Amino acid sequence: MMRVNHVSAKYKTITGDVLALKDVDFEIRDNEIFGIAGESGCGKSTLLKVLYDIMNFPLELAEGSVELEYMDSGERKRLVTDREHPGGIRGAWWNAISYVPQAAQSVLNPVYRIEDQFYELFRRHRRSEGRKAMYERVNRYLDEVGLPRDVLKSYPHQLSGGMRQRVVIAMATFLHPSMIFADEPTTALDVVVQKGILQMLMELQAKMGNSLVIVSHDMGVHYQITNRMGIMYSGSMVELGPTDDIFASPLHPYTQMLIRSLPKIGDQGMRVGIQGGPPDLRNPPPGCRFAPRCKMAKPECSQSAPKFTEVQPGRFAACHLLNR
């Protein structure tokens, strides 16, 4: 389980600090698929970097903490990352938590065969076992995830984009971590390959019983595979709840507009997009940051920021219209 406690994060720039995350507060439960959605530039990938504790300059934690609890050899362990303990969660990388980065098919080392890259991962985290043991385990695991064994002898450029993506996912899940983060795992892949990647992630999560966190701007991806989801806008979480409930009755005006923009089978009409774009985080508007684009905005929306509160059992949102 992971608990995100009122996290704010900023980017250091030559003109000053830019607050990229503002007071994000939620939890990721054991054995669930959790989605993080929103337009480009809303802070999804930045949030994932904070959760995975890969905050390198110019990104740094401004406030709050991230707590990770996981099982290790039958013992429940707890790690914390905050301003006093930077890098606290990094000790659990790959063993307890793993990360499939955006454009993952491009992260493989082009001058090493796939088997050598698996071995490097294995050597760093299973030092007591040799290369022969690694080969045996990798071959068995490739069979489990539906990858042919001959990919081990291949260089990355010899594989298709979809196959490279599968290899990276296989590496990220090879040590059976308790939590997996996937940042836009279907980007730049055709629709057929996208379906295969999502199916692979779902099957691995069901088999391992771990938590899977999916970041995607594609609401259709979240509808297909997530149990719960959070909607990000301008660095803040504006809605959170069970995925089925969010799609059936979205609470926040931004979520409503996102869902209305989705195409439907048999629909011959034009879909309605969301006018404008996310605000410049260097100079965000006062009050609710969505107010300039919201057709239901009231004067109070531009005067004070709404609090992220539980509106219904298990459902949270940040909107003045819901707090009346």
Positions of predicted regions on the chain:
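The feature captures the beta-strand-to-loop junction immediately N-terminal to the Walker
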Residues: 37-39
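Short catalytic/signature loops enriched in Gly
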Residues: 75-79, 242-324
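Conserved ABC ATPase signature
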Residues: 155-159, 163
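A short, proline-enriched helix->beta-strand linker immediately N-terminal to the Walker B motif
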Residues: 174-178
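P-loop NTP-binding/switch modules centered on Walker-like glycine-rich loops
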Residues: 185, 189-269
